Amino acid sequence: MSLHVKGPVCQTCGDIGFEEALVFCDSCMFESIHRYCLGITPIPFTEYITWICEDCDNSESDSDCNEVDQTVKKKKKSRNQPLVVLAEDNVLQEPLEGSKREESSCSRKPHELTCLDGNGESVLEAADSSSVPDHSSCTSKRKEVDQTANLGHILERSEKKKKKKKKKKSINHSPPVLAVEDHELQGTTNVVEPVEVSSSSPTKETMESKRQESSDSRKPHELTCLVGDSETANSSSVPEHNSCAVKKRKLSSGNKQIQLADGSSSCRVAESNMPLTLTSRNYRAQPIKIPIWRGLMSVKGGNSCTMDGIVAHVSSLACPKVHETASSLKGRLSAEILPRLEVWPKTFLKNGGPKDESVALFFFPSSESNDEKVFDSLVDKMKKNDSAMRCVLNDAELLLFTSYMLPKDSWTFNSKYYLWGVFKPRQTSRY
């Protein structure tokens, strides 16, 4: 008998065909198929094609199913294993962990509960129904634990809100002002105890709404909080001083009422950090502690001199426009001495002279300055000659006067006379 060895045959067409086009199974390496019988786009014979026959494909799928069944059985066995619980005498520290323990204890079977007593020996709990807690009692315990967890979260949120409110209050506090060495200014009397005004009081809300209305009514090209005289009041770029007339407001806190002045020429609206410690008669502007300008001042005129180490402090009643203009001052100011009446704003004449709230900047010699005596002598000469100084800036003029021009109780600060200034818009040529 002669044995005929069959060659590879394509599973699709059943013929040998082109043996070069046969592709063998990657799993059994026995079954084959033609490249052109796969039903895919033509591929060169040199490229490798991955193909698995039907028999190998079915066997692999069956093995995968068996593996999945084995993993499922292993998971079920691990769930059915007895759980070990440690006895705890202390109260639950974290409500979330307590809720998890309650759930796990409720899901256990009676014969699977194993505990440790105080001596560390394992004790098997009785399988009686009396020793096993009911599911209803477990659910009630779980609800109690969840309620304690919610209460803990609510308390944490309330504490965070309180901390945020404290931070906001500390930010809204008034800026520090220069401390008075003698603890009193000349001529101060009848100091009233400070009255606290809560942030939620209606009076504060009305004050803030009035500030916003007044600030919105300003034109963008106006230099607000700057002193203007009658000559420049006709131009649209200069606000009238009459619009800064003093208005009284009543602040109620409990059964106490205090009347305060809004401020006249220096600022249209007082800052929200206005201290409420003095009545309207004795309430005065104070220089803010941190100077906004520090530099050299050269004086030209009858008393020519140069003073170094001069500092300027913004008034506590000054508006944001004063801060903006003062912060743009150069390190060297050139001042010209002129007769006071020549540069005296007409608004001061109409309102009976300047008040402490008319001050925009306070000028003092710094503690490091060596020209303190020169500064004091300049103030004395300006008082005797009834003089003033003018510094020409880009968009405004800085007018400087002696403290003698203010009310008597504002003449000195730390027993020293000083200079104070206001900003005045520059006149633009009409032609």
UniProtKB/Swiss-Prot annotation:
Protein name in UniProt: PHD finger-containing protein 1
Disordered: region residues: 125-221
Keywords: Metal-binding, Transcription, Transcription regulation, Zinc, Zinc-finger
Natural source organism: Arabidopsis thaliana
PROSITE patterns the record matches: ZF_PHD_2
Residue ranges with Basic and acidic residues bias: 205-221
Compositional bias (Low complexity): 191-202
Chain positions of all zinc fingers (PHD-type): 7-59
Gene Ontology MF annotations: histone reader activity; zinc ion binding
Organism phylogeny: Eukaryota, Viridiplantae, Streptophyta, Embryophyta, Tracheophyta
Composition bias type Basic residues, residue spans: 160-171
Keyword flag Transcription: yes
Residues bound to Zn(2+) 1: C10, C13, H34, C37
Gene3D superfamilies: Zinc/RING finger domain, C3HC4 (zinc finger)
Binding site residues for Zn(2+) 2: C25, C28, C53, C56
Pfam families documented for this protein: SPOC_AIPP2
UniProt function note: Together with AIPP3/BDT1, cooperates to form a BAH-PHD bivalent histone reader complex able to read histone H3 lysine 27 trimethylation (H3K27me3) histone marks in order to regulate transcription, especially to prevent early flowering; promotes AIPP3/BDT1 binding to H3K27me3.
Compositionally biased intervals (Polar residues): 128-139
Domain of life: Eukaryota
Subunit relationships: Interacts directly with AIPP3/BDT1.
Annotated gene: PHD1
Keyword Metal-binding: yes
Knockout mutant characteristics: No obvious developmental defects. Plants missing all PHD finger-containing proteins (e.g. PHD1, PAIPP2/PHD2, AIPP2/PHD3, PHD4, PHD5 and PHD6) exhibit an increased expression of flowering genes leading to an early flowering phenotype under long-day conditions as well as growth retardation.
GO biological process terms on file: negative regulation of transcription elongation by RNA polymerase II
